[in-house]
Design a protein with these regions (language model features):
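Ligand/substrate-recognition segments at binding pockets and active sites
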Residues: 181, 334-408, 451
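Aromatic- and charge-enriched surface segment that lines or borders ligand/interaction sites
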Residues: 60-105, 126-128, 214-220, 267-268
Length: 514
Protein backbone atom coordinates (compact mmCIF):
# COMPACT_ATOMS: atom_id res chain seq x y z
CA UNK A 1 0.00 0.00 0.00
CA UNK A 2 1.33 3.44 -0.94
CA UNK A 3 2.53 5.66 1.87
CA UNK A 4 1.03 9.13 2.00
CA UNK A 5 3.82 11.74 2.31
CA UNK A 6 3.73 13.73 5.53
CA UNK A 7 4.85 17.33 6.07
CA UNK A 8 8.43 17.57 7.27
CA UNK A 9 10.40 20.44 8.71
CA UNK A 10 12.94 22.28 6.61
CA UNK A 11 13.25 24.04 3.30
CA UNK A 12 12.52 27.50 1.94
CA UNK A 13 9.57 29.12 0.20
CA UNK A 14 9.86 32.34 -1.81
CA UNK A 15 7.12 34.94 -2.19
CA UNK A 16 7.25 37.68 -4.82
CA UNK A 17 6.26 40.68 -2.69
CA UNK A 18 4.97 43.76 -4.50
CA UNK A 19 6.14 46.97 -2.85
CA UNK A 20 9.06 47.93 -0.65
CA UNK A 21 8.69 47.34 3.11
CA UNK A 22 9.99 50.09 5.35
CA UNK A 23 10.08 49.97 9.16
CA UNK A 24 9.66 46.38 10.35
CA UNK A 25 7.78 47.35 13.47
CA UNK A 26 3.97 47.11 13.73
CA UNK A 27 3.75 50.52 15.40
CA UNK A 28 5.21 52.23 12.31
CA UNK A 29 3.57 50.56 9.32
CA UNK A 30 3.42 52.80 6.27
CA UNK A 31 2.28 50.49 3.47
CA UNK A 32 0.76 47.10 2.72
CA UNK A 33 4.05 45.32 2.06
CA UNK A 34 5.38 46.41 5.46
CA UNK A 35 2.19 45.12 7.08
CA UNK A 36 2.66 41.81 5.25
CA UNK A 37 6.16 41.30 6.63
CA UNK A 38 5.22 42.41 10.14
CA UNK A 39 2.36 39.90 10.23
CA UNK A 40 4.95 37.13 9.95
CA UNK A 41 7.11 38.48 12.77
CA UNK A 42 4.73 39.93 15.36
CA UNK A 43 1.48 38.91 17.03
CA UNK A 44 -1.31 40.90 18.64
CA UNK A 45 -3.57 40.14 21.56
CA UNK A 46 -6.36 39.13 19.17
CA UNK A 47 -7.07 37.97 15.65
CA UNK A 48 -10.05 36.94 13.52
CA UNK A 49 -10.93 33.32 12.76
CA UNK A 50 -12.52 31.83 9.66
CA UNK A 51 -16.01 32.65 10.97
CA UNK A 52 -15.04 36.31 11.62
CA UNK A 53 -15.05 35.80 15.38
CA UNK A 54 -12.46 37.75 17.38
CA UNK A 55 -10.21 35.21 19.10
CA UNK A 56 -7.24 35.44 21.42
CA UNK A 57 -3.63 35.12 20.26
CA UNK A 58 -1.30 36.61 22.89
CA UNK A 59 -4.37 36.88 25.11
CA UNK A 60 -6.16 33.72 26.20
CA UNK A 61 -9.47 35.46 26.86
CA UNK A 62 -11.02 38.64 28.25
CA UNK A 63 -13.94 39.93 30.27
CA UNK A 64 -16.09 43.03 29.80
CA UNK A 65 -17.57 45.13 32.60
CA UNK A 66 -21.38 45.53 32.83
CA UNK A 67 -21.13 49.11 31.51
CA UNK A 68 -19.03 47.89 28.54
CA UNK A 69 -16.27 50.37 29.32
CA UNK A 70 -13.62 48.12 30.87
CA UNK A 71 -11.93 45.18 29.14
CA UNK A 72 -9.67 42.92 31.19
CA UNK A 73 -7.36 40.74 29.08
CA UNK A 74 -5.61 37.65 30.42
CA UNK A 75 -2.17 37.42 28.86
CA UNK A 76 -1.01 34.03 27.61
CA UNK A 77 1.54 32.21 29.78
CA UNK A 78 4.61 30.42 28.48
CA UNK A 79 5.18 32.57 25.41
CA UNK A 80 8.77 33.52 24.56
CA UNK A 81 10.24 36.14 22.31
CA UNK A 82 12.41 34.88 19.45
CA UNK A 83 15.52 35.73 21.51
CA UNK A 84 14.33 33.41 24.30
CA UNK A 85 13.21 36.06 26.78
CA UNK A 86 9.77 35.55 28.36
CA UNK A 87 6.81 37.50 27.03
CA UNK A 88 4.39 39.03 29.52
CA UNK A 89 1.89 41.72 30.43
CA UNK A 90 4.70 44.29 30.77
CA UNK A 91 5.36 44.00 27.03
CA UNK A 92 1.70 44.69 26.30
CA UNK A 93 1.64 47.71 28.61
CA UNK A 94 4.86 49.02 27.08
CA UNK A 95 3.52 48.69 23.52
CA UNK A 96 0.31 50.58 24.20
CA UNK A 97 2.06 53.25 26.22
CA UNK A 98 4.27 53.92 23.19
CA UNK A 99 1.11 54.23 21.08
CA UNK A 100 -0.09 56.86 23.57
CA UNK A 101 3.20 58.74 23.79
CA UNK A 102 2.85 62.39 22.73
CA UNK A 103 5.95 61.97 20.55
CA UNK A 104 4.26 59.12 18.68
CA UNK A 105 2.79 60.79 15.59
CA UNK A 106 1.50 57.91 13.51
CA UNK A 107 -2.12 57.73 12.24
CA UNK A 108 -4.49 56.67 15.01
CA UNK A 109 -2.36 58.01 17.86
CA UNK A 110 -5.13 60.31 19.09
CA UNK A 111 -7.50 57.34 19.33
CA UNK A 112 -5.15 55.39 21.59
CA UNK A 113 -4.61 58.42 23.82
CA UNK A 114 -8.30 58.26 24.72
CA UNK A 115 -7.98 54.69 26.03
CA UNK A 116 -6.83 53.94 29.56
CA UNK A 117 -4.24 51.14 29.71
CA UNK A 118 -3.13 49.73 33.06
CA UNK A 119 -1.95 46.59 34.81
CA UNK A 120 -4.64 44.39 36.33
CA UNK A 121 -4.07 41.29 38.39
CA UNK A 122 -1.22 38.91 37.69
CA UNK A 123 -0.82 38.54 33.93
CA UNK A 124 -3.65 40.94 33.17
CA UNK A 125 -3.93 44.18 31.19
CA UNK A 126 -6.96 46.45 31.62
CA UNK A 127 -8.27 48.78 28.90
CA UNK A 128 -10.74 51.51 29.89
CA UNK A 129 -12.85 53.25 27.24
CA UNK A 130 -14.65 56.59 27.36
CA UNK A 131 -17.70 55.16 25.58
CA UNK A 132 -18.82 51.63 24.68
CA UNK A 133 -17.20 50.25 21.53
CA UNK A 134 -18.16 46.69 20.65
CA UNK A 135 -15.44 46.43 18.00
CA UNK A 136 -12.66 47.29 20.47
CA UNK A 137 -11.22 43.74 20.85
CA UNK A 138 -10.53 43.69 17.11
CA UNK A 139 -8.37 46.82 17.37
CA UNK A 140 -6.00 44.83 19.59
CA UNK A 141 -4.65 42.96 16.57
CA UNK A 142 -1.77 45.47 16.61
CA UNK A 143 1.54 43.65 17.05
CA UNK A 144 3.20 43.67 20.47
CA UNK A 145 6.87 44.71 20.65
CA UNK A 146 9.50 43.59 23.21
CA UNK A 147 9.95 45.93 26.17
CA UNK A 148 13.38 44.53 27.03
CA UNK A 149 14.69 45.68 23.64
CA UNK A 150 13.10 49.13 23.39
CA UNK A 151 12.82 50.32 26.98
CA UNK A 152 14.13 53.87 27.38
CA UNK A 153 13.79 54.69 23.68
CA UNK A 154 11.62 57.49 22.30
CA UNK A 155 9.25 56.57 19.43
CA UNK A 156 11.63 57.95 16.79
CA UNK A 157 14.49 55.87 18.23
CA UNK A 158 12.32 52.75 18.18
CA UNK A 159 11.49 53.32 14.52
CA UNK A 160 15.16 53.74 13.57
CA UNK A 161 16.48 50.88 15.71
CA UNK A 162 18.04 47.87 13.97
CA UNK A 163 15.46 45.82 15.89
CA UNK A 164 12.86 47.52 13.67
CA UNK A 165 14.80 46.37 10.62
CA UNK A 166 17.65 43.92 10.08
CA UNK A 167 17.33 42.43 13.59
CA UNK A 168 13.53 42.50 13.91
CA UNK A 169 11.88 39.75 15.93
CA UNK A 170 8.68 39.17 17.85
CA UNK A 171 6.63 36.22 19.04
CA UNK A 172 5.40 35.30 15.55
CA UNK A 173 6.49 32.32 13.44
CA UNK A 174 9.48 34.06 11.82
CA UNK A 175 12.21 36.58 12.57
CA UNK A 176 14.42 38.59 10.23
CA UNK A 177 17.49 36.68 9.10
CA UNK A 178 18.88 39.13 6.58
CA UNK A 179 17.86 42.05 4.38
CA UNK A 180 19.32 43.28 1.12
CA UNK A 181 18.08 45.41 -1.77
CA UNK A 182 16.38 42.44 -3.42
CA UNK A 183 14.85 40.44 -0.59
CA UNK A 184 14.03 39.98 3.07
CA UNK A 185 14.92 36.54 4.36
CA UNK A 186 12.92 35.39 7.37
CA UNK A 187 14.17 32.56 9.56
CA UNK A 188 12.02 30.25 11.63
CA UNK A 189 11.50 31.57 15.17
CA UNK A 190 12.76 28.69 17.36
CA UNK A 191 10.39 29.73 20.16
CA UNK A 192 7.23 30.12 18.08
CA UNK A 193 4.18 28.06 18.98
CA UNK A 194 3.23 26.30 16.79
CA UNK A 195 6.50 25.82 14.96
CA UNK A 196 6.49 26.43 11.20
CA UNK A 197 7.59 23.59 8.96
CA UNK A 198 9.61 26.02 6.83
CA UNK A 199 13.10 26.98 7.95
CA UNK A 200 13.04 30.12 5.82
CA UNK A 201 10.54 32.33 4.02
CA UNK A 202 12.14 34.67 1.49
CA UNK A 203 10.20 37.78 0.48
CA UNK A 204 11.69 38.89 -2.82
CA UNK A 205 10.61 42.48 -3.43
CA UNK A 206 9.35 43.96 -6.70
CA UNK A 207 8.36 47.58 -7.44
CA UNK A 208 4.73 48.53 -6.94
CA UNK A 209 4.98 50.43 -10.23
CA UNK A 210 5.49 47.16 -12.14
CA UNK A 211 3.63 44.31 -10.41
CA UNK A 212 3.90 42.19 -13.55
CA UNK A 213 7.53 41.53 -12.58
CA UNK A 214 6.31 39.70 -9.49
CA UNK A 215 3.92 37.58 -11.55
CA UNK A 216 6.71 36.80 -14.01
CA UNK A 217 8.87 35.61 -11.11
CA UNK A 218 6.30 32.94 -10.26
CA UNK A 219 5.81 31.96 -13.89
CA UNK A 220 9.56 31.48 -14.36
CA UNK A 221 10.09 29.65 -11.07
CA UNK A 222 12.04 32.46 -9.40
CA UNK A 223 9.32 32.63 -6.73
CA UNK A 224 6.70 30.25 -5.38
CA UNK A 225 3.90 32.64 -4.40
CA UNK A 226 2.52 36.02 -5.42
CA UNK A 227 -0.50 37.87 -4.07
CA UNK A 228 -2.62 40.90 -4.83
CA UNK A 229 -2.89 39.94 -8.48
CA UNK A 230 -4.98 42.38 -10.48
CA UNK A 231 -8.08 40.89 -12.14
CA UNK A 232 -6.79 41.44 -15.67
CA UNK A 233 -3.67 39.39 -14.83
CA UNK A 234 -5.41 36.31 -13.43
CA UNK A 235 -6.04 34.65 -16.78
CA UNK A 236 -2.28 34.48 -17.41
CA UNK A 237 -2.00 32.24 -14.33
CA UNK A 238 -5.08 30.05 -14.61
CA UNK A 239 -4.43 26.70 -16.19
CA UNK A 240 -0.66 26.92 -15.78
CA UNK A 241 0.85 23.59 -14.81
CA UNK A 242 2.23 23.63 -11.30
CA UNK A 243 0.22 26.66 -10.14
CA UNK A 244 -2.84 26.92 -7.93
CA UNK A 245 -4.84 30.16 -7.84
CA UNK A 246 -6.64 30.95 -4.58
CA UNK A 247 -9.32 33.64 -4.38
CA UNK A 248 -10.89 35.23 -1.29
CA UNK A 249 -13.21 38.11 -0.62
CA UNK A 250 -11.79 41.24 0.98
CA UNK A 251 -13.25 43.77 3.40
CA UNK A 252 -12.89 46.61 0.93
CA UNK A 253 -15.51 49.00 -0.32
CA UNK A 254 -15.35 51.06 -3.48
CA UNK A 255 -17.84 53.88 -3.86
CA UNK A 256 -18.47 57.35 -5.27
CA UNK A 257 -19.08 59.98 -2.60
CA UNK A 258 -21.40 62.90 -3.32
CA UNK A 259 -20.29 66.17 -1.72
CA UNK A 260 -23.75 67.41 -0.79
CA UNK A 261 -22.56 70.13 1.60
CA UNK A 262 -19.82 71.77 -0.42
CA UNK A 263 -18.83 71.93 -4.06
CA UNK A 264 -21.55 69.51 -5.14
CA UNK A 265 -24.44 70.94 -3.12
CA UNK A 266 -26.33 72.45 -6.06
CA UNK A 267 -26.36 69.04 -7.77
CA UNK A 268 -26.51 66.54 -4.93
CA UNK A 269 -28.35 68.35 -2.14
CA UNK A 270 -31.59 66.69 -3.23
CA UNK A 271 -31.71 63.02 -2.10
CA UNK A 272 -33.97 62.19 -5.07
CA UNK A 273 -31.14 63.19 -7.40
CA UNK A 274 -28.60 61.11 -5.51
CA UNK A 275 -30.91 58.12 -5.62
CA UNK A 276 -31.42 58.56 -9.35
CA UNK A 277 -27.66 58.37 -9.89
CA UNK A 278 -27.51 55.21 -7.77
CA UNK A 279 -30.20 53.65 -9.99
CA UNK A 280 -28.34 54.70 -13.13
CA UNK A 281 -25.21 52.65 -12.41
CA UNK A 282 -24.94 49.06 -13.61
CA UNK A 283 -22.49 47.68 -11.03
CA UNK A 284 -22.43 44.18 -12.45
CA UNK A 285 -21.39 45.49 -15.86
CA UNK A 286 -18.49 47.37 -14.27
CA UNK A 287 -17.42 44.29 -12.31
CA UNK A 288 -17.60 42.14 -15.44
CA UNK A 289 -15.91 44.51 -17.87
CA UNK A 290 -13.33 46.26 -15.68
CA UNK A 291 -12.65 43.65 -12.99
CA UNK A 292 -13.08 40.47 -15.04
CA UNK A 293 -15.78 39.37 -12.61
CA UNK A 294 -13.33 39.16 -9.70
CA UNK A 295 -15.27 41.35 -7.29
CA UNK A 296 -18.75 41.45 -5.80
CA UNK A 297 -21.19 44.07 -7.07
CA UNK A 298 -22.03 45.64 -3.72
CA UNK A 299 -24.68 48.35 -3.21
CA UNK A 300 -24.04 48.49 0.56
CA UNK A 301 -21.49 50.29 2.76
CA UNK A 302 -20.77 46.96 4.49
CA UNK A 303 -18.83 44.60 2.18
CA UNK A 304 -20.41 41.37 0.99
CA UNK A 305 -17.77 39.50 3.00
CA UNK A 306 -18.95 41.07 6.26
CA UNK A 307 -21.09 39.12 8.71
CA UNK A 308 -23.55 42.05 8.94
CA UNK A 309 -24.08 42.42 5.18
CA UNK A 310 -27.78 42.92 4.33
CA UNK A 311 -29.08 41.41 1.09
CA UNK A 312 -32.39 43.17 1.74
CA UNK A 313 -30.73 46.59 1.75
CA UNK A 314 -28.77 45.66 -1.36
CA UNK A 315 -31.99 44.98 -3.27
CA UNK A 316 -33.81 48.21 -2.32
CA UNK A 317 -32.73 50.31 -5.32
CA UNK A 318 -31.48 48.07 -8.14
CA UNK A 319 -30.10 49.24 -11.46
CA UNK A 320 -32.91 50.85 -13.47
CA UNK A 321 -31.84 53.51 -15.96
CA UNK A 322 -35.43 54.28 -16.97
CA UNK A 323 -36.47 54.93 -13.35
CA UNK A 324 -33.33 57.02 -12.87
CA UNK A 325 -34.24 59.26 -15.82
CA UNK A 326 -37.80 59.70 -14.54
CA UNK A 327 -36.58 60.63 -11.07
CA UNK A 328 -34.23 63.24 -12.50
CA UNK A 329 -37.07 64.75 -14.48
CA UNK A 330 -39.27 64.80 -11.36
CA UNK A 331 -36.47 66.69 -9.59
CA UNK A 332 -36.47 69.32 -12.35
CA UNK A 333 -33.42 68.14 -14.30
CA UNK A 334 -34.59 68.06 -17.92
CA UNK A 335 -32.62 66.86 -20.93
CA UNK A 336 -31.61 69.46 -23.52
CA UNK A 337 -32.97 68.26 -26.90
CA UNK A 338 -29.74 69.20 -28.67
CA UNK A 339 -26.98 68.17 -26.26
CA UNK A 340 -28.92 65.53 -24.28
CA UNK A 341 -27.30 66.95 -21.14
CA UNK A 342 -29.76 67.67 -18.35
CA UNK A 343 -30.19 71.17 -16.96
CA UNK A 344 -32.20 72.92 -14.25
CA UNK A 345 -32.85 76.66 -14.06
CA UNK A 346 -30.10 77.33 -16.57
CA UNK A 347 -27.48 75.13 -14.89
CA UNK A 348 -26.24 72.13 -16.86
CA UNK A 349 -25.65 68.91 -14.95
CA UNK A 350 -21.91 68.88 -15.52
CA UNK A 351 -19.76 67.74 -12.59
CA UNK A 352 -16.20 66.71 -11.83
CA UNK A 353 -15.24 63.34 -10.34
CA UNK A 354 -11.79 62.93 -8.80
CA UNK A 355 -10.16 59.51 -8.70
CA UNK A 356 -6.76 57.89 -8.22
CA UNK A 357 -4.74 57.56 -11.42
CA UNK A 358 -4.12 53.84 -10.99
CA UNK A 359 -5.81 50.61 -12.03
CA UNK A 360 -8.67 49.92 -11.56
CA UNK A 361 -9.75 53.36 -10.35
CA UNK A 362 -9.16 55.10 -13.67
CA UNK A 363 -11.06 52.46 -15.63
CA UNK A 364 -13.96 52.42 -13.16
CA UNK A 365 -14.23 56.21 -13.17
CA UNK A 366 -14.36 56.25 -16.95
CA UNK A 367 -16.99 53.47 -17.02
CA UNK A 368 -19.11 55.40 -14.51
CA UNK A 369 -18.85 58.56 -16.59
CA UNK A 370 -20.11 56.68 -19.66
CA UNK A 371 -23.07 55.21 -17.77
CA UNK A 372 -24.10 58.56 -16.29
CA UNK A 373 -23.75 60.30 -19.64
CA UNK A 374 -26.37 57.86 -20.95
CA UNK A 375 -28.96 59.49 -18.66
CA UNK A 376 -27.84 63.06 -19.41
CA UNK A 377 -25.22 63.73 -16.75
CA UNK A 378 -21.78 64.84 -17.89
CA UNK A 379 -19.01 63.69 -15.57
CA UNK A 380 -15.48 64.90 -16.24
CA UNK A 381 -12.91 62.61 -14.63
CA UNK A 382 -9.87 64.15 -12.97
CA UNK A 383 -7.13 61.60 -12.25
CA UNK A 384 -4.65 62.23 -9.45
CA UNK A 385 -1.89 60.46 -7.54
CA UNK A 386 -3.46 58.74 -4.52
CA UNK A 387 -1.57 60.94 -2.04
CA UNK A 388 -2.76 64.15 -3.74
CA UNK A 389 -6.33 62.83 -3.92
CA UNK A 390 -6.27 62.24 -0.17
CA UNK A 391 -4.54 65.43 0.96
CA UNK A 392 -5.98 68.00 -1.45
CA UNK A 393 -9.49 66.67 -2.04
CA UNK A 394 -10.78 64.06 0.42
CA UNK A 395 -9.44 65.60 3.63
CA UNK A 396 -10.43 69.11 2.56
CA UNK A 397 -13.72 68.01 0.94
CA UNK A 398 -12.89 70.03 -2.16
CA UNK A 399 -14.70 67.85 -4.67
CA UNK A 400 -18.12 67.27 -6.23
CA UNK A 401 -17.82 63.52 -6.70
CA UNK A 402 -14.95 61.31 -5.54
CA UNK A 403 -14.21 57.68 -6.32
CA UNK A 404 -12.83 55.97 -3.23
CA UNK A 405 -11.60 52.46 -2.48
CA UNK A 406 -11.04 51.77 1.19
CA UNK A 407 -10.42 48.83 3.51
CA UNK A 408 -13.23 49.05 6.08
CA UNK A 409 -12.12 45.98 8.05
CA UNK A 410 -13.86 42.84 9.23
CA UNK A 411 -16.06 44.58 11.78
CA UNK A 412 -19.18 46.45 10.56
CA UNK A 413 -18.42 49.48 12.75
CA UNK A 414 -18.01 52.38 10.29
CA UNK A 415 -18.40 55.19 12.80
CA UNK A 416 -15.12 56.77 11.70
CA UNK A 417 -16.24 56.89 8.07
CA UNK A 418 -19.87 58.00 8.29
CA UNK A 419 -20.60 59.62 11.68
CA UNK A 420 -21.12 63.39 11.46
CA UNK A 421 -19.41 64.00 14.80
CA UNK A 422 -16.02 62.71 13.69
CA UNK A 423 -13.23 65.23 14.27
CA UNK A 424 -11.56 66.94 11.32
CA UNK A 425 -8.31 65.74 9.84
CA UNK A 426 -9.67 62.33 8.87
CA UNK A 427 -11.47 60.94 5.85
CA UNK A 428 -15.21 61.16 6.54
CA UNK A 429 -18.23 61.32 4.25
CA UNK A 430 -21.11 62.35 6.54
CA UNK A 431 -23.30 65.33 5.69
CA UNK A 432 -24.05 68.26 7.97
CA UNK A 433 -27.82 68.02 7.64
CA UNK A 434 -30.37 65.20 7.95
CA UNK A 435 -27.87 62.75 9.32
CA UNK A 436 -29.31 62.04 12.77
CA UNK A 437 -30.68 58.57 12.11
CA UNK A 438 -27.38 57.45 10.58
CA UNK A 439 -25.47 58.79 13.58
CA UNK A 440 -27.82 56.95 15.95
CA UNK A 441 -27.37 53.63 14.16
CA UNK A 442 -23.58 54.02 14.27
CA UNK A 443 -23.69 54.90 17.97
CA UNK A 444 -26.05 52.03 18.78
CA UNK A 445 -23.89 49.62 16.80
CA UNK A 446 -20.89 50.50 18.93
CA UNK A 447 -22.85 50.33 22.18
CA UNK A 448 -24.49 46.95 21.49
CA UNK A 449 -22.35 44.03 22.60
CA UNK A 450 -24.24 40.88 21.62
CA UNK A 451 -24.07 39.98 17.89
CA UNK A 452 -27.86 39.76 17.29
CA UNK A 453 -28.37 43.32 18.57
CA UNK A 454 -25.46 44.61 16.51
CA UNK A 455 -26.73 42.82 13.42
CA UNK A 456 -30.17 44.44 13.74
CA UNK A 457 -28.62 47.89 14.07
CA UNK A 458 -26.29 47.48 11.11
CA UNK A 459 -29.06 46.12 8.90
CA UNK A 460 -31.01 49.29 9.67
CA UNK A 461 -27.87 51.35 8.95
CA UNK A 462 -27.62 49.79 5.50
CA UNK A 463 -31.34 50.27 4.78
CA UNK A 464 -31.19 53.96 5.70
CA UNK A 465 -27.99 54.49 3.73
CA UNK A 466 -29.68 52.92 0.71
CA UNK A 467 -32.55 55.41 0.94
CA UNK A 468 -30.43 58.50 1.70
CA UNK A 469 -27.92 57.57 -1.02
CA UNK A 470 -24.90 59.53 0.25
CA UNK A 471 -22.79 57.57 -2.23
CA UNK A 472 -22.94 55.13 -5.12
CA UNK A 473 -21.62 51.95 -3.55
CA UNK A 474 -20.05 49.89 -6.30
CA UNK A 475 -18.18 46.72 -5.37
CA UNK A 476 -16.03 44.91 -2.85
CA UNK A 477 -12.88 43.34 -4.21
CA UNK A 478 -11.33 39.89 -4.20
CA UNK A 479 -7.79 38.92 -3.23
CA UNK A 480 -6.07 36.56 -5.66
CA UNK A 481 -3.07 34.48 -4.56
CA UNK A 482 -1.05 32.25 -6.88
CA UNK A 483 0.84 29.37 -5.29
CA UNK A 484 3.38 27.00 -6.80
CA UNK A 485 2.58 23.35 -6.20
CA UNK A 486 6.07 23.06 -4.74
CA UNK A 487 4.64 24.68 -1.59
CA UNK A 488 1.99 22.63 0.18
CA UNK A 489 -0.49 23.47 2.92
CA UNK A 490 -1.30 27.00 1.72
CA UNK A 491 -4.89 27.99 2.50
CA UNK A 492 -6.77 31.18 3.35
CA UNK A 493 -10.10 32.07 4.90
CA UNK A 494 -13.06 32.86 2.66
CA UNK A 495 -12.68 36.55 3.52
CA UNK A 496 -9.37 38.20 4.39
CA UNK A 497 -7.36 41.36 4.58
CA UNK A 498 -4.24 40.99 2.40
CA UNK A 499 -1.78 40.24 5.21
CA UNK A 500 -4.13 37.51 6.48
CA UNK A 501 -2.84 35.26 3.70
CA UNK A 502 -0.05 34.41 6.16
CA UNK A 503 -2.45 33.50 8.98
CA UNK A 504 -1.79 29.78 8.49
CA UNK A 505 1.84 30.04 7.38
CA UNK A 506 2.85 27.47 10.01
CA UNK A 507 0.98 24.90 7.86
CA UNK A 508 3.13 25.57 4.78
CA UNK A 509 5.75 23.00 3.84
CA UNK A 510 8.04 22.01 0.98
CA UNK A 511 9.64 18.91 2.47
CA UNK A 512 7.90 15.59 3.07
CA UNK A 513 8.67 12.31 4.79
CA UNK A 514 7.23 8.82 4.72
Amino acid sequence: MATVPKPARGGTAVEALVGQPTVLNPLFETNDSTRDVNSLIYQGLTSVDAQQNVVGVLATDWTVSPDHLTYTFNIRDGVKWADGQPFGADDVLFTFHILQDLEYQQPGADVWRQVGVSAGGSGQVVFTLRAPEASFPLTLRVGIIPKHIYTGMAPAQIASSPFSGVRAFGTGPFKVGSINQLAITLDRNPNAVPQPYLDHLVLRTYPATDPQLAIRAVLTGAADLVGGIQPQEVDTLLGRNGLTVLEARMFTNSFVSFNSDGDGKSFFGDPKVRLALVQAVDRQKIVSEVLAGRADADPNPIPTAGWAYSASAASLHPYDAIAAAKNLEAAGWLADPATKIRAKKGTSFKVMMVAADSYPNQQIAEALARQLLAIGIQVDVKLLPASKLLQDYLLTRKYQMALISIDVGADPDQYWLWHSGTEGGAVNFAYARGWGIIDKDLEDGRAAVDPPSRLAVYIDFQMVMADLAPAIFLYSGHYVYAVSQRVHGVHVNKAIEPSDRFQYVTDWYVNTSG
